[in-house]
Amino acid sequence: MMKILFIYRHPSMGFSIGKVFRPIEEEMKKYAEVDSIYMPTSQYSLNSIWQNIKTTRKAINSKKYDIVHITGTEHYLIPFLLGEKVVVTVHDLGHYFDIHGLKKILFWILQIFSLKFAKAITCISNFTVQELK
């Protein structure tokens, strides 16, 4: 039976498209072994990012998953999951176009460049597809 891990951002981060994945996750349980984890932190400090990476690696090391699906904004996890079949859902890149300077460079590295390491990328809209181009 296929094993799938869904990774969700921390629940305190406000509205999350992750709620859309819950019914999908439940339906998939009919055909696959499905687990999910929530990130322990919602901040983007180095320490918080490191905590999220460790939590994700711990889950992946505990069981061999066929697919790891990052459902939210934690694209920065992808390079730390090399060797895994990572699917990521991109919601939008709106924030990227609103920031400047060093923040924009860091956002590009953590959120956009990281996508190059994903096995597959899904987008919630054609608008998001165009943003990625």
Segment roles from a protein language model:
Residues 3-78:
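Active-site donor-binding segments of glycosyltransferases and PAPS-dependent sulfotransferases
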Residues 67-69, 80-99:
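Active-site proximal beta-strand in glycosyltransferases
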